[in-house]
Amino acid sequence: VVQVITPGTYMNYKNYDENNFLASAYKKDGNIYFAFCDIMTGDSRCTILKTMDDLQDEILRNNIKEIITIKDQELNVSAYITEVEVDENIEKEKTSNLSDSNLRICCNILLDYIEKTQNKDVNSLKNFEVYFKDKFVYMTNYSLKNLEVTQNMANGGKKGSLLSIIDKTSTAAGARKLKKWL
């Protein structure tokens, strides 16, 4: 087997303006550690969440296609979930910059899954960017939808949204960056 295709690892080159995020979630010590990356672009981010509602909101905001979690960690979210058996002590070079050990475990679970299913060296991915919701003006997914920031309410398409009006980018990478900023 050369490559395993799953919802989070499928690469649709026709819709290159959209990210295809694969994520991992790890529950420990009353927190939910959440990491996600796009294996096509290498964009990688992670955060620490407090509640399942926060997790669900991050899934919807980032259009997560698949979530990897350790067996027996129950996640009640609306996303495709893949349970894996992973050694929580695995260490990847890409996560050495992360100071929180549980966040590092979460990122390592994701990187290990990518290596195993894609036969791909994870060194081509960017280092994980840690972000915290309380450091930014934060809008829930429902607010973003009602204000039609990235998609219209009529059919969920880009046309008629704020993004469609200000998007004058000439490359797919630029379009993804602008959407990330919004």
State what each model feature region is.
Residues 1-182:
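Charged catalytic and DNA/RNA-contacting regions of genome-maintenance
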